[in-house]
Amino acid sequence: KFHAYSTGWGPWAAPPAAGQILLDLRRMNRILEIDAQNMFAVVEPYVVAGQLQAEAMKVGLNNHISGAGAGTSVLANACCFQGGGPDCMYFASPQDSILSIEWVTPTGDILRTGSLGSGLGWFCAEGPGPSMQGVIRGALGGAGGWGVVTKIAIRLVHWPGPAVMPIEGTVP
């Protein structure tokens, strides 16, 4: 029996019973693409929101930062739990920013949603046929998911500020 869980906070951080394995996706931490013209990014599971934000701002774009902070996974916030935060009024809820998902099922099949599933790239959340987004998200995200998400395309928004945020500070 296979059941995928996020390695985030709470009881999902470790296998809950004997005979189970924990997949460590920590090395899957790359931003695979930032498409400035079409305003989206393709990321792996361990890309954190602050990492994506720093790169997106360089091309005049921005992404959602969850209420848990800039050190949380972009992918996990969008497709594995609610991931809300103070900027949801501007960005919409994270799950509404999903454009396409690639995930591996318990049988080893690779499934792709939206336009990616039709071989047309990462640009659109819905493709021909029924939407599969609800299957991977489940009732509350990863707790109801049916596989391991390996890549996600997430919608970005316009960033009117500087390409690099000026940082100043003093030690007390």
Label the model's feature ranges.
Residues K1-M28:
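Glycine-rich N-terminal segment of FAD-binding domains in flavoprotein oxidoreductases
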Residues I31-I34, V43-P45, A49-P172:
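FAD-binding subdomain of flavoenzyme oxidoreductases
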Residues N38-F40:
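Short, solvent-exposed beta-strand edge segments and adjacent coil->beta transition regions
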